[in-house]
Amino acid sequence: MQQHLKYKIMTNIKHLAIIMDGNARWADQHNLTKSEGHKAGADKIRELLPEFINLNIPYITLYTFSSENWQRSSTEVDFLIKLLSIYFKNELNSLHKNGVKIKVIGRLNLLSSSLQKQINNAIELTKNNNKITLCIAFSYGSRQEIVDACTKIIASGKKEISESDIGHALYDPEMPDVDLLIRPGGVYRISNFLLWQAAYAELYFSPKYWPAFNKDDIIEAINDYSKRKRTFGKR
């Protein structure tokens, strides 16, 4: 009964965003390589996605690779890009079978043509699924997204820009505002992630590294969220 109650609470959350932080530090802690840490982080998606589905969360966004991550070593960057490709290769059929709609946001033009094709194929295959939307933020930065949106609006010939114009010009105009943003890893910042969409999001930080995060940690974050009063600037 208690577990059912916890799940019922979750129906209030329409969009859960997660900064998947701490892969490398988790690897150091376990005497593993950074690559092994990132792989463990990717495996965690496979583990937790069924829980998100059971919790009836309509929209999940995962921050997997930021625009600033391009400045890391070429070895690490190449592995992270390869990991995304492997994820789609290994998981796409299962995701599709389970009703998951795939979206990918970011400056995808910086990726190889083969990976862009793989991403587009995943989006096309799953576009009519409606159980849950899994949005992967890759080569993504929120400031860059807002700049790209404004550039797009200006190119359309508009002289004045409204909030609505920007919202419709973002990478995913259908993305709902973030209700709860979770960041594991013991770091207390949002690192250029969904700044527009998370304007009124509740923030939850955990000292646990992402590869160590589990279902109970998600439930704990949800229960914490359920106790908060969201005023959206009102009284």
Curated annotation (Swiss-Prot):
SUPFAM superfamilies per UniProt: Undecaprenyl diphosphate synthase
UniProt: Mg(2+) binding residues: D21, E202
EC numbers for this chain: 2.5.1.-
Active site residues according to the UniProt entry: D21, N69 (proton acceptor)
Any Pfam family hit: Prenyltransf
Recorded GO MF terms: ditrans,polycis-polyprenyl diphosphate synthase [(2E,6E)-farnesyl diphosphate specific] activity; magnesium ion binding
Binding site for substrate: 22-26, 34, 38, 66-68, 70, 72, 183, 189-191
Record text on cofactor binding: Binds 2 magnesium ions per subunit.
InterPro entries associated with the record: UPP_synth-like, UPP_synth-like_CS, UPP_synth-like_sf
Keywords, sorted A to Z: Magnesium, Metal-binding, Transferase
Cofactor list: Mg(2+)
BP GO terms, sorted: polyprenol biosynthetic process
NCBIfam families per the UniProt record, alphabetical: uppS
Sequence similarity: Belongs to the UPP synthase family.
Quaternary state and interactors: Homodimer.
Function noted in UniProt: Catalyzes the condensation of isopentenyl diphosphate (IPP) with allylic pyrophosphates generating different type of terpenoids.
Protein known as: Isoprenyl transferase
